[in-house]
Amino acid sequence: MSKEKEEIKIIAQNRKAFHDYFIEETYEAGIELVGTEVKSVRQGKVNLKDSFARVENNEVILYNMHISPYEKGNIFNKDPLRPRKLLLHRHEINKLSGYVSRKGYTLIPTKVYLKRGLVKVELAVAKGKKLFDKREDIARRDAKRELEKQFKEKQLGI
C-alpha cells in the first residue's frame, strides 16, 4: 500500500456546524456500531443534524446521530438515535475533556466517512458563534465574492 493520501469516501457532512461554530481543532475517531448500522451507513443513511458528543467516564459518547434502520435488518435493527461510543486514544480523550471543561466549548461531529473500509467520524472542538459573528462572516463572504467578480470582469475586459 502506498504512503500517498488514502481513499476516503464521505458519507455525511455537517455543514451547519461551520456556520454555527468556530472550529478550533478536529480529530478522527472510530465509532462503535452494530452490523445493520454499518450497512445503513454504507448506503449513506446518516444524519448529523443536532448531533454532539460528550466526555463521560473517560469515554467519548456521540448523541443524536441518526442512522436509519437497515431495511433487511428486521429484529437486529437498533434505535436510530441511540448513543454511540467513539473510539479514541486515551491522550486524545484527556485533551478533549480539557477543551470541553472550558466555558463555551463543545464537541461536534463534522463528517462521517469510510476510510479503508472502516466507518470514521471527524470530531471537532467548537465554540459557539454569536449572531453578530455570523453576520460578519456573511458580509466577509459577500465582499470576497464581489471582489472576485470584479477581478474576473476586469480580466475578461467587460
UniProtKB/Swiss-Prot annotation:
Q: Which UniProt keywords apply?
A: Cytoplasm, RNA-binding
Q: Which CDD domains match?
A: SmpB
Q: Which PANTHER family match?
A: SSRA-BINDING PROTEIN (PTHR30308:SF2), TMRNA-BINDING COMPONENT OF TRANS-TRANSLATION TAGGING COMPLEX (PTHR30308)
Homology family: Belongs to the SmpB family.
InterPro entries linked: SmpB (IPR023620), SsrA-bd_prot (IPR000037), SsrA-bd_prot_CS (IPR020081)
Role according to the record: Required for rescue of stalled ribosomes mediated by trans-translation. Binds to transfer-messenger RNA (tmRNA), required for stable association of tmRNA with ribosomes. tmRNA and SmpB together mimic tRNA shape, replacing the anticodon stem-loop with SmpB. tmRNA is encoded by the ssrA gene; the 2 termini fold to resemble tRNA(Ala) and it encodes a 'tag peptide', a short internal open reading frame. During trans-translation Ala-aminoacylated tmRNA acts like a tRNA, entering the A-site of stalled ribosomes, displacing the stalled mRNA.
Please report the organism this UniProt entry assigns to the protein.
Answer: Caldanaerobacter subterraneus subsp. tengcongensis (strain DSM 15242 / JCM 11007 / NBRC 100824 / MB4)
GO MF, one annotated term:
RNA binding
Q: Name one GO biological process term.
A: trans-translation
Q: Where in the cell is it found?
A: Cytoplasm
Q: Could you tell me which Pfam families the record lists for this protein?
A: SmpB
Protein name in UniProt: SsrA-binding protein
Give the CC-aspect GO terms.
cytosol
Q: Which SUPFAM superfamilies match?
A: Small protein B (SmpB) (SSF74982)
Please classify the protein's predominant subcellular localization into one broad category.
cytoplasm
**Gene3D superfamilies tied to this protein:** 2.40.280.10
